[in-house]
């Protein structure tokens, strides 16, 4: 099946470019990659944690408990000992400065892979890197991971103000004031935003408002979303606003390799027309990155 995956990760231990190349040769699949997020592969939570998470975050009271717990995962960008229990006691170290240059060099020979320019504006010289790579032919847009890098609105604002060509922005939210998020999306209304992970950790609390904004889209990436949440996204959002993304190569493993077949089992597209299905898998993201 042909698709255009709008968010995959480079991981030096897991990303299998032969697998991606075979998908392109067989189905003409395309991908937008993001730099590595940890030294060693990203820690994968237990299935129990993934199962409970949507229920916790959908409850207003439990949401605040989850917010407090989330602040205990890392110390000085290293996963704390207690949380290693859930990741096989591996020593994960969060990358604070995404290595865009390395990824761009790696994907240079792959015509079917583009890249997000992942910027952490809390780091010194981030704006210089932004300016030096902004016009790179492989860069389709900007990525901001509010949760991973604990970004404030002012820091995000600086990057968005320097986005002179209004390139699309892939943004993953954090536990933050919803009104402030919406204010930013409205302020930069000439920029197209893709809200990653179905709006995690806010989910339905933010859906009604972002669905009203013509410049804002939502994707279905990662195991932070279950079947019910994905079904609700298809019920809530206009079909041209839903983006196919996977978070490859994490989770959904078959013989220690990411399986798109397993990932796709969560997504019911039977209710879609042929056009809507093609738009979801291919055209919606193409329309965003190609104007």
Feature locations, PLM:
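Mid-domain alpha/beta scaffold segments of enzyme catalytic cores
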Residues: 1-154, 261
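Mid-to-C-terminal alpha-helical segments outside catalytic/metal-binding sites
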Residues: 1-4, 15-31, 38, 239-241, ...
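Conserved, mostly hydrophobic/aromatic
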Residues: 7, 24, 103, 133, ...
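Short active-site segment of divalent metal-dependent hydrolases/proteases
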Residues: 10-11, 200, 250
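Short, well-ordered coil/turn elements that cap or connect secondary structure elements
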Residues: 26-27, 108-110, 136, 188-190, ...
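Short secondary-structure boundary segments
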Residues: 36, 222, 246-248
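Glycine- and small hydrophobic-enriched segments that form the cores of compact globular domains
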Residues: 114-118, 168-169, 268, 272-273
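Catalytic pocket-lining loop regions of alpha/beta-barrel enzymes
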Residues: 140-141, 148-149, 153-244
């Amino acid at each position: 099946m042909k698709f255009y995956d709008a968010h995959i990760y480079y991981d030096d231990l897991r990303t299998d470019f032969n697998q991606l190349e075979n998908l392109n040769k067989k189905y003409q699949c395309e991908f937008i990659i993001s730099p590595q997020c940890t030294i060693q592969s990203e820690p994968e939570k237990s299935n129990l944690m993934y199962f409970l998470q949507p229920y916790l975050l959908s409850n207003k009271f439990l949401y605040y408990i989850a917010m407090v717990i989330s602040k205990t995962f890392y110390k000085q960008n290293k996963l704390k000992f207690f949380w290693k229990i859930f990741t096989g006691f591996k020593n994960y170290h969060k990358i604070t400065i995404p290595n865009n240059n390395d990824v761009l060099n790696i994907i240079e020979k792959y015509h079917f892979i583009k890249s997000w320019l992942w910027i952490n504006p809390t780091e010194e010289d981030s704006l210089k890197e932004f300016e030096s790579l902004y016009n790179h032919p492989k860069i389709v847009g900007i990525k901001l991971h509010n949760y991973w890098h604990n970004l404030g609105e002012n820091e995000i604002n600086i990057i968005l103000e320097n986005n002179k060509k209004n390139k699309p922005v892939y943004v993953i939210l954090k536990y933050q004031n919803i009104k402030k998020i919406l204010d930013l999306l409205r302020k930069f209304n000439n920029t197209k935003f893709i809200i990653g992970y179905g709006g995690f950790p806010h989910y339905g609390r933010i859906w009604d408002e972002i669905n009203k904004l013509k410049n804002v889209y939502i994707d279905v990436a990662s195991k932070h979303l279950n079947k019910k949440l994905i079904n609700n996204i298809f019920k809530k959002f206009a079909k041209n606003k839903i983006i196919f993304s996977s978070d490859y190569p994490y989770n959904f493993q078959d013989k220690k390799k990411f399986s798109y077949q397993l990932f796709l089992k969560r997504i019911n597209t039977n209710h879609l027309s042929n056009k809507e299905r093609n738009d979801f898998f291919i055209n919606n993201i193409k329309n965003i990155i190609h104007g």
